[in-house]
């Protein structure tokens, strides 16, 4: 599932996001302390670094009212506006904690494998994001059914779509920079979040390299075989 790669612009932005996240040190998060942070400091700093890199990036906060059996809520993520000469500006979504949206109780092994195949950080369009949501909601229903458990409202397709499809406020760089006076309990969680994020990204990239090795080795063998045949052909003249 993770191999559903985006286009060139998405892949380039994904590479930039990975590099910037690896470059962040926990001491840099101090400028964005603001109460219960829940990773907001990481997102604001990433937006700052993306803007320095020339991207039109912003933190987006979506909010929605509950309806029927769907609870209300809010969500914070990042978007980047990319110029497209053919279709006009294109909006790409960045979610730095993507897998957490699909975690469920007592998940069966196949679901856990599918969850681990998701990108650690999502970078892409809303239509491609919706494809992920559809697949994961169906898989979650099946997994929960194996344990005779219902799908909770906050894992329904309607609720998940509200996170990125609801009306949102696009914010610039966080202006309320505060002096860091030690790691508060809430902000200390962000240090752990950043550490786990980097660790997961390293594992993802390493796994990707291992998966590519057989393909690269096969390509090398084909090249070597072609070269031997070419040389024999030249020597036969």
Placement of each model-derived feature along the sequence:
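Intrinsically disordered, low-complexity regions enriched in proline, serine, glycine
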Residues: 59-61, 69-70, 91-95, 103-106, ...
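Acidic, Ser/Thr-rich intrinsically disordered and amphipathic helical segments
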Residues: 12-19, 41, 45, 93, ...
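A short acidic/basic microdomain associated with nuclease active sites
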Residues: 51-80
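Short acidic loop-to-beta-strand element that houses the catalytic metal-binding Asp/Glu
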Residues: 72-95
């Amino acid at each position: 599932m993770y191999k559903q790669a985006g286009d060139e612009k998405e892949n380039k932005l994904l590479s930039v996001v990975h590099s910037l996240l690896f470059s962040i040190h926990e001491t840099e998060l101090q400028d964005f302390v603001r109460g219960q942070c829940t990773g907001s400091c990481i997102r604001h700093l990433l937006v700052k670094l993306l803007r320095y890199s020339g991207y039109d990036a912003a933190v987006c906060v979506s909010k929605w009212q509950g309806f029927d059996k769907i609870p209300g809520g809010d969500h914070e993520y990042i978007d980047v506006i990319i110029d497209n000469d053919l279709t006009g500006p294109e909006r790409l979504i960045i979610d730095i904690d993507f897998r957490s949206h699909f975690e469920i109780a007592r998940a069966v092994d196949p679901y856990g494998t599918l969850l681990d195949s998701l990108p650690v950080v999502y970078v892409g369009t809303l239509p491609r994001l919706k494809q992920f949501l559809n697949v994961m909601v169906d898989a979650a229903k099946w997994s929960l059914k194996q344990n005779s458990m219902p799908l909770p409202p906050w894992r329904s397709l309607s609720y998940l779509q509200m996170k990125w499809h609801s009306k949102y406020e696009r914010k610039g760089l966080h202006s309320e920079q505060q002096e860091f006076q030690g790691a508060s309990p809430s902000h200390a969680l962000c240090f752990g979040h950043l550490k786990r994020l980097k660790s997961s990204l390293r594992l993802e990239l390493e796994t990707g390299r291992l998966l590519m090795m057989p393909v690269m080795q096969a390509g090398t063998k084909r090249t070597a075989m072609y070269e031997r045949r070419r040389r024999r052909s030249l020597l036969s003249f």
